């Protein structure tokens, strides 16, 4: 499957922006007419794949859903760009916006503040801590400022891509029921099972019973399924049902926080913070790849 050069618009905890895992997932997406992501997050995969006849993005996080709705709207997008481009990189603004964005009723202003936080949060962990650079620089300015300024170069591509996508804000159960049948492919990237990682990171967690319910729903889903996450005993029914599973070794950037400064580490982090991502496919997804 040919990928586009459009990137996800912001870092997202547990997202699939890592080039290695993204390439692996894109390579396993079978042919489809219709496409749905029940756990959309930063939309790394959706934005990077070729467009399908019908595409559905869903997330229960109202902040990220409002952001994508604003970016998809031609009038709102221009206003968003004009406002966001004026903002400097500032810890005070980061903290202020972290307190105030949920109470903003203007969708454009809420999206601007939400995006500011998402772009500058360390490790994609929304509003948990400010991800700043102390001594590193790029393009004649600090890495933090350079990254913020460079993020606007990608947004017009995101705008063009997301305009054709149906944006939902609903429970994953409802989404899987509504968007299924002949020609559908569901790519699911739920929050990692709690027992496979340290606590925190997600604003909307899934409990073990939710993961069990998800697996049960995917086993009877009418369509092709590709699922990503860390392997867990909760996912054992997939192997029993004959689903294919592939493993990809990646670096967990969110684990790179140094103990003393709270900043992202380098070097030893890459040596010691390895994670094994799993990608599962159901029989229908595998059948389509063979045809």
Role assignments for model-derived ranges:
Residues 68:
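Conserved SAM-binding loop
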Residues 52, 71-74:
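A short linear boundary/processing microfeature
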